[in-house]
Amino acid sequence: MAGGTGSPAAIVLADAAASYGGRPVLTGIDLTVRVGERLALMGRSGAGKSTLIGLIHGQAPDRVALVPQAAALVRPLSVFHNVYMGRLDRRSTLHNLRNLVRPARRDVAAVEDVLGRVGLADQLWAKAGALSGGQQQRVSVARALYNGRPILVGDEPVSALDRQQGGRILAELARSHETLILALHDVALALAHTDRIVVLEAGRIVLDAPSAGLDPARLSPFYEAA
């Protein structure tokens, strides 16, 4: 269910700014995301979406499960171990070291369940580096699902998937997390799977509106130069 104005704030940015190499990347960002919202960040390449994702993650790292733009997998390790990393900080060092050599049955079962939700249960023991780009992206999503924190922040989490498969993954993320904040480039997916769209242009918010009141024609100009 979408978060309303009465829902508590999950993320608050007030006049936030960021620069890279002395060059402003984000300026005057005022953004409040409420518990229960499904928000899409959109805009051309270079508009500042990834930087904003970083600021949002930094606001509440202990409440955020992150799907980074690059899958960031440890390629020589198995899919199991890469997904298991989503909870490393909640397990003892001894348990984590033991799982590296002889994974506990309950952990294997939990990871296998999560992989089933992204269509990769049969890849549990495959090396992450042997997977296709789309499979690696789904492993990254599975790691965030396994992490289980209430706010899911994703930087193009389905960019390597076709629209149908991407839609299924976004629906699974919505079922599994209380609040979604997703940088997306696919207008159709954003309209179908979020309830609010925020568009960035040259580091500023130029549109912030309910998805229900928007359509592809309204959003496509922001992508013409993408």
Model-derived features with residue positions:
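Conserved structural motif at the start of ABC-family nucleotide-binding domains
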Residues: 11, 26-28
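Conserved ABC ATPase signature
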Residues: 127-131, 135
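Catalytic Walker B motif of ABC-type/P-loop ATPase nucleotide-binding domains
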Residues: 152-155
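Hydrophobic anchor residue at the start of the ABC signature
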Residues: 141
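Conserved ABC ATPase "signature" region
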Residues: 96-123
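H-loop/switch region of ABC-family ATPase nucleotide-binding domains
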Residues: 184-185
